[in-house]
C-alpha cells in the first residue's frame, strides 16, 4: 500500500494536479501534512478533473511525526549530497520501482509513504533524516528543481510500470517498522561498545546501517535472521 504525501503544499492547483496524476497511475491515498492553502477550492477541483474523489478523501495531519505509522518512509529531494553525506545519498525513481517490484511485488500489507517536500524549499534535513531512503530525479545540474506535480508524475509513472507485470511475492510477509527499530536498537548497542577515533564516525555508522536495512526491503524471515546474528554479537560483547 503506497500513500502519496505532500508536506506543507502551498498551491491548490498543484494539489489538484497531483490528485489527477495519482488516478492516472492507480494510486488513491493522498496525505497532506499541514497544508498552507485550501486544497478543496475551485482551482484544486479544476486541476483534479475526474480525480476529485481523491481530493475529498485526502487525509490531513499536523506534522511529519505522523509518518511513523508507515513501515517505510521514502523522501524525495533535488539536493544531492556527496558520498560522505549519507542522509542525501539517493536512488533514482526507476531503481526504487525496480526494488519495490522485486522485493514487495503485489504485497499490500507493507505500508509505504512517498513524501514530496515543499514547493519552494523541499524537505528539511531533519525530515530527510527521518526518511528510510531518499529518491531523486536526474535533471540538469543548472536547474534541478522540478514543479511539485511534475516530480510526482515522474515518480508515480516509474512506480506504475512494474505493476503491469506478474507479481509472485504477495504471500510473503515483510519486515515492519517495529522490526527495523529493534534491529537499529541492537546495532546501537553494538556501536556503543566500539571505540572510534572520531566521535562523528559512530553516528555515520548508525546512519549507514539504518539506510542499508531500509534499502534492502527485508522479508520478515530475513529480518529475523539478521536479529539473530546481532544477538550473537551482543552476547559475545557481554561475555
Located regions from the model:
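Post-transcriptional modification and biogenesis factors for structured RNAs
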Residues: 1-239
